[in-house]
Amino acid sequence: MSHSLALAHRFPALRPRTGLWLGLAAAALLAVAAAAQAQFVPPETGTQVHDASALKPPAGARVAIVEFADYECPDCARANPLLKEAAAKYKIPLVRHDFPLPMHNWSFTAAVNARWFDTKSKALGDEYRDQVFANQISIYSPAILAQFTEKFAADHHVALPFAVDPQGKLAAEVKADYALGQRIGIEHTPTIWVVTANSKGAPFVEVVDRSKLFQLIDQAIADTRSR
């Protein structure tokens, strides 16, 4: 099997899943991921916010979704399609912040890679993020992440340099996001808020129960319209 074909089999969200071995490997990795996910169950009471300065929509928006996520967090991968659906449905920004947890061995690098793809186009960077989440169960080491990233770049006709961040600028941006999350008071991933500007209601509401995400957005939009 050629190197490129082997990579295609390894990342099922990029290519059709084939072979019994892949199913068995996925089942084993799912068990590991499920165990890891238990570390990140959000508290029912939500986050005690210490610094709310970042919990506001970007310029020009009245309502937005703000998320702090880790690329190895299984619950972040589960939340991603819903957040994208909500942002598209309501035509509001999805503001993603990196919060790579210290116990994970490749999430920081994935965050740096995503920011490098952002330098080519924001759409490409977001597509990389989405594909990392979609293939998360197959990316079980830094070496596999590197192979995944090489294939993603090749599939999108982008020349991937030997070092994507030789000066450490992108890594510094990821660290700044993590420090911001610490200042806010984040203790788990994903942490998600619906935030508003010029609203008579709460300026930000944490989405503790994701089944209520659309309801919270509806309320935020109604609050901004009533002013």
List the predicted regions and their residue ranges.
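N-terminal secretory signal peptides that target proteins for export/translocation
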Residues: 1-16
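C-terminal cap of thioredoxin/glutaredoxin-like
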Residues: 5-7, 39, 150-227
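Bacterial N-terminal signal peptides
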Residues: 19-32
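Boundary at the C-terminal end of the N-terminal hydrophobic targeting segment
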Residues: 34-40
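Short, flexible loop segments at the rims of nucleotide/cofactor-binding pockets, characterized by
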Residues: 43-44, 72, 169-170
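A short beta-strand-turn-helix
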Residues: 44-63
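Extracellular/periplasmic catalytic domains that process cell-envelope and extracellular macromolecules
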Residues: 57-60, 87-89, 106, 183-188
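Structural alpha/beta surface segment adjacent to cysteine/selenocysteine redox centers
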Residues: 66, 71, 77-152
